[in-house]
Amino acid sequence: MRVLLIEDDSATAQTIELMLKSEGFNVYTTDLGEEGVDLGKIYDYDLILLDLNLPDMSGIDVLRTLRVAKINTPIMILSGSSEIDTKVKTFAGGADDYMTKPFHKDEMIARIHAVVRRSKGHAQSVIKTGDIVVNLDAKTVEVNGNRVHLTGKEYQMLELLSLRKGTTLTKEMFLNHLYGGMDEPELKIIDVFICKLRKKLAASAHGKHHIETVWGRGYVLRDPNEQVNAA
């Protein structure tokens, strides 16, 4: 999961970054609202964490600017203010959630997962695709009731495929999701990850493959039950 953190207090930013990275998130930080707006427009994040008190512009202005620009990335506000008026303004401006500092790590992680799930159209923390069950909170995968042990990169790919089930994802999208533009390997590494992921899933799925290759475009995760119904 890719998170943009817009926070001007370096100590707070470092603490949040460590919290999220310990959960396997890819975190990108900036202490300026204007830069946060630019990054939010250019890159595809799963979530934006936004502080309200920034040195160059208010967090509410950052929020409104992103929404006016039709950026639909979920935005969670981080603020030391518990004032109702402030909360009302942020929700009216397009915020998806609001957390008051200081906050507990477990609550923050749970809220992040909930907001991202809703943004992808999933109200529950478990996504089922045929025999495959992905638990987004526990970061576990089961096939036919059997636990499948995946590497971090393999899990991130399956999570992305599950969240965007039925949508063809390009190799560039996978690469951006896994590495976020930092020390990215060649595109062919995605084929290697997909091959390994397919083998692990098929071993518990009686040889069935749920990840399809869309030649010249990328890969897609399809629910076999939906295909049967469509037929």
Curated annotation (Swiss-Prot):
It comes from Caulobacter vibrioides (strain ATCC 19089 / CIP 103742 / CB 15) (Caulobacter crescentus). This is Cell cycle transcriptional regulator CtrA. GO terms for cellular component: cytosol; protein-DNA complex. The modification 4-aspartylphosphate is found at D51. SMART domains: REC (SM00448), Trans_reg_C (SM00862). One of its GO terms (molecular function) is DNA-binding transcription activator activity. The keyword Phosphoprotein applies. Forms part of a two-component regulatory system CtrA/CckA that controls multiple events in the cell cycle, including cell division, stalk synthesis and cell cycle-specific transcription. Binds to a group of cell cycle-regulated promoters critical for DNA replication, DNA methylation, and class II flagellar biogenesis. Residues 124-223 bind DNA.
